[in-house]
Amino acid sequence: MAEPRQEFEVMEDHAGTYGLGDRKDQGGYTMHQDQEGDTDAGLKESPLQTPTEDGSEEPGSETSDAKSTPTAEDVTAPLVDEGAPGKQAAAQPHTEIPEGTTAEEAGIGDTPSLEDEAAGHVTQEPESGKVVQEGFLREPGPPGLSHQLMSGMPGAPLLPEGPREATRQPSGTGPEDTEGGRHAPELLKHQLLGDLHQEGPPLKGAGGKERPGSKEEVDEDRDVDESSPQDSPPSKASPAQDGRPPQTAAREATSIPGFPAEGAIPLPVDFLSKVSTEIPASEPDGPSVGRAKGQDAPLEFTFHVEITPNVQKEQAHSEEHLGRAAFPGAPGEGPEARGPSLGEDTKEADLPEPSEKQPAAAPRGKPVSRVPQLKARMVSKSKDGTGSDDKKAKTSTRSSAKTLKNRPCLSPKHPTPGSSDPLIQPSSPAVCPEPPSSPKYVSSVTSRTGSSGAKEMKLKGADGKTKIATPRGAAPPGQKGQANATRIPAKTPPAPKTPPSSGEPPKSGDRSGYSSPGSPGTPGSRSRTPSLPTPPTREPKKVAVVRTPPKSPSSAKSRLQTAPVPMPDLKNVKSKIGSTENLKHQPGGGKVQIINKKLDLSNVQSKCGSKDNIKHVPGGGSVQIVYKPVDLSKVTSKCGSLGNIHHKPGGGQVEVKSEKLDFKDRVQSKIGSLDNITHVPGGGNKKIETHKLTFRENAKAKTDHGAEIVYKSPVVSGDTSPRHLSNVSSTGSIDMVDSPQLATLADEVSASLAKQGL
């Protein structure tokens, strides 16, 4: 098998980085998962997928370019626009992962890291000459992108991109979708190739149509395409070829990431867990049957997790298919691996199981070495389309269990010798290297292809710890050689670390059922013809399932397991302090006896001042106060004392002689004294003459009030003649003529006043 493994530079964010030698980046199309319209447009734009000279279209490169970290919008947005329901439906059927599919195949076990997704998901299909960009890195963008891609791939079931898409989309779901929109044919082709790997017969047999389970296939294709070139011509089948209603919810919930599996979209951890749980390595038939069912009829979501050794069903197809896809595991396993991962995804996320019709393209000259892989695919229709989902689930469960046993480490940490993509390894969650026989790059491809499913399974399953994903590297050496042809290292975590959850498989089964109807066209091969359109209503279920699984059972248990509080032992309860029962209680460290001891005071000395010390003599000897009468005989009294009445001050005796002075002779009495009564002041005797002032007569009113004062001069004779009356004129002037006496009186008054100084 000429499987030129193309070295993928895995850029977590660049699906385009999956630069498969054969793959050509189809125009830098970036699908915006957020835009549902992009789904149709992107799918319709699949012309962007220009078939490589090999004829392999590489939508993945664009996806790589477009690959971006999943955004809430991307994750939230429906993967496929309702406008492209047909396309989505067509793509969805492949979404379902047959239970037979191993986790790695389904991409469940391997939650391809962005790098893995970038490098590992895009596998060149050297044989087909087409680099199927299985690793369309899905941005965790809206599932719509994945749906868009799915829509672009008629054969690819539109897997809800719930957990897985969220996981894988970070790798480039958005770009993947964009490319899917542009390179819908490529995506379909790649997915078909992935499905071919899954189914065994390449999708190419499907006429370049995406197998219905293209998304699931995409997960597987991611692994398969990475591991082996996909023979199928670029999946240019019209995105709506299947005419399936976009199973946006389903894709979102589950393996739609698987679709970007080619885009290496890491599955949500919970999703991976679920897928792992549901991924018991199913026989390759399981996935094939599931796919066929998915294509022929709506997938029955029967979750039988029977771990059966991966039977290399369709090994002839698988070998050819893997030869094309360089898928280490038999094509059936590749599909199965995808199927389990997608099936798991479907279970987990109700992803439509990618129909195994696409594997029809698997028959190529290349032998497909089959890597036993946990098949997490839900019971999808087998390539024949006859396999019941239940059978697939059971087979996948058995195979996954066996695969798990066989594959202690699903994730090939070491890049396959053929794989030049070192980045892919880092992204592979599984630590254990896969057996050298199985090319790790194949695992990585499968992981990428199924990684969406696987990643989602991991995310969902609390068993994510369990390395359930089928070791893609466990493929026989022949497969490894094929894988080597595909240079994609199996960096994508080949094994879902979460063991398949028995509880989740039913969900996957339902998704598988959806996928199966969506991909009735290509049950056995990755035919570009998308499976029957899967009802988009299933997508919501898938999404819900996918989102719920993330909770680890341990955490739930821890929450639920609350130790019951034992009932208090009331019999042994003692009363509290202060209760009536404690009335006699004596606190303290025991009984304290207060003993009344009489002190022996005989030796005690009383303090100073006590009655006992009345006779006490202070130290220093006894002091006797002797009363001595003072001898006052020699004492002289002080001055002024009675004893000194007769005392004469020193300095000689002073005699005071009283002389009787004859004042009368020598002294003149002061003025005013009795002696001076007769005294006449100097200037001679003055007589004070008293003059009777007759002011009334002389008075003159200052204000003339018109009244006449009749003054009867006493001097006037008894004559009462009115003319003797002084008539005061209204002017107040006295008629001096009438009263000549007034003139003299006035003169006298003025003179007296002058004398007195008035």
UniProtKB/Swiss-Prot annotation:
Location of region: Disordered: 1-573, 715-734
One cellular-component annotation, GO: axon
Composition-biased stretches (Pro residues): 491-503
Effect noted on mutating L583V: In FTD1; less able to promote microtubule assembly than wild-type tau
Residue segments, region Microtubule-binding domain: 561-685
InterPro entries tied to this protein: MAP2/MAP4/Tau (IPR027324), MAP_tubulin-bd_rpt (IPR001084), Tau (IPR002955)
Outcome reported for the amino acid change (mutating N596K): In FTD1; with parkinsonism
Glycosylation sites: 87, 383, 467, 480, 491, 525, 542, 551, 555, 576, 597-598, 664, 670, 686, 717
Deamidated asparagine, modified sites: N484, N596
Residue positions where Omega-N-methylarginine is found in the record: R472, R666
Keyword terms of this UniProt record: Acetylation, Alzheimer disease, Cell membrane, Cell projection, Cytoplasm, Cytoskeleton, Disease variant, Disulfide bond, Glycation, Glycoprotein, Isopeptide bond, Membrane, Methylation, Microtubule, Neurodegeneration, Parkinsonism, Phosphoprotein, Repeat, Secreted, Ubl conjugation
The Tau/MAP repeat ranges on this chain: 561-591, 592-622, 623-653, 654-685
Biased segments, Low complexity type: 324-340, 442-453, 504-531
Residues bearing PTM Phosphoserine: 46, 61, 214, 502, 508, 512, 515-516, 519, 531, 552, 554, 579, 602, 610, 622, 641, 669, 673, 713, 717, 721, 726, 733, 739
Molecular function via GO: actin binding; apolipoprotein binding; DNA binding; double-stranded DNA binding; dynactin binding; enzyme binding; histone-dependent DNA binding; Hsp90 protein binding
Effect on the protein of changing K574T: In PIDB; reduces the ability to promote microtubule assembly by 70%
Pathological condition linked to this protein in its record: In Alzheimer disease, the neuronal cytoskeleton in the brain is progressively disrupted and replaced by tangles of paired helical filaments (PHF) and straight filaments, mainly composed of hyperphosphorylated forms of TAU (PHF-TAU or AD P-TAU). O-GlcNAcylation is greatly reduced in Alzheimer disease brain cerebral cortex leading to an increase in TAU/MAPT phosphorylations.
Subunit structure comment from the entry: Interacts with MARK1, MARK2, MARK3 and MARK4. Interacts with PSMC2 through SQSTM1. Interacts with SQSTM1 when polyubiquitinated. Interacts with FKBP4. Binds to CSNK1D. Interacts with SGK1. Interacts with EPM2A; the interaction dephosphorylates MAPT at Ser-396. Interacts with PIN1. Interacts with LRRK2. Interacts with LRP1, leading to endocytosis; this interaction is reduced in the presence of LRPAP1/RAP.
PANTHER family in alphabetical order: MICROTUBULE-ASSOCIATED PROTEIN, MICROTUBULE-ASSOCIATED PROTEIN TAU
Name listed for the protein in its UniProt record: Microtubule-associated protein tau
Organism this protein belongs to: Homo sapiens
Taxonomic placement: Eukaryota, Metazoa, Chordata, Craniata, Vertebrata
